[in-house]
């Protein structure tokens, strides 16, 4: 189920000991915003966590990586109706038992105004996110940094 209505803020956090393993989103053309849905799976993560400040300004590129051995466990965001864009903060927690190595950046997971789906393979976790805003489409395209 989507956790926000278009134009509304959201604050998603996986339960303790879990990481984000699925990111899904649809675009509402009328309200010029996305609805978001996240999935989590159990990984060996600790409660040593940190939350970023805002990783982007409205209309500007976003490029964020969780620090150290941390991986993505939560995302918070709010929308501006004048600029028709969102700002994002990220929550990251330490992974026990493995270093975040073998990282790569995914293919773009959506087109402007199109549906988005990222499903993270077993044994991988989301380390970060990269996104660009386009004024003509009033939307962002996304890639994610994935690590083993």
Swiss-Prot record:
What's any one GO cellular component for it?
Answer: extracellular matrix
Biological process annotations from GO: cell adhesion; collagen fibril organization
What keywords are annotated for this sequence in UniProt?
Cell adhesion, Disulfide bond, Extracellular matrix, Glycoprotein, Secreted
Compartments (UniProt record) = Secreted, Extracellular space, Extracellular matrix
| Disulfide bridge positions per record | 14-40, 66-93, 103-147
Record bears the keyword Hydrolase: no
- Family recorded in the similarity comment: Belongs to the dermatopontin family.
State what this protein does.
Seems to mediate adhesion by cell surface integrin binding.
The family database entries (PANTHER family) matched by this protein are listed as: DERMATOPONTIN-LIKE ISOFORM X1, DERMATOPONTIN-RELATED
Name of the molecule in the record = Dermatopontin
Native organism is: Biomphalaria glabrata (Bloodfluke planorb)
């Amino acid at each position: 189920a989507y956790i926000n209505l278009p134009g509304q803020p959201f604050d998603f956090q996986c339960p303790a000991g879990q990481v984000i393993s699925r990111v899904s989103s649809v675009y509402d053309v009328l309200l010029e915003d996305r609805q978001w849905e996240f999935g989590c799976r159990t990984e060996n993560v600790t409660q040593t966590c940190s939350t970023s400040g805002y990783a982007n300004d409205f209309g500007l590129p976003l490029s964020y990586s969780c620090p150290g051995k941390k991986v993505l466990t939560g995302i918070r965001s709010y929308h501006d109706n004048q600029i028709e864009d969102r700002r994002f903060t990220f929550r990251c927690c330490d992974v026990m038992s493995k270093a975040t190595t073998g990282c790569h950046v995914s293919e773009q997971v959506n087109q402007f105004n199109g549906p988005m789906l990222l499903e993270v393979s077993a044994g991988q976790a989301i380390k970060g996110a990269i996104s660009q805003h386009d004024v003509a489409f009033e939307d962002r395209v996304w890639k994610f940094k994935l690590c083993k």
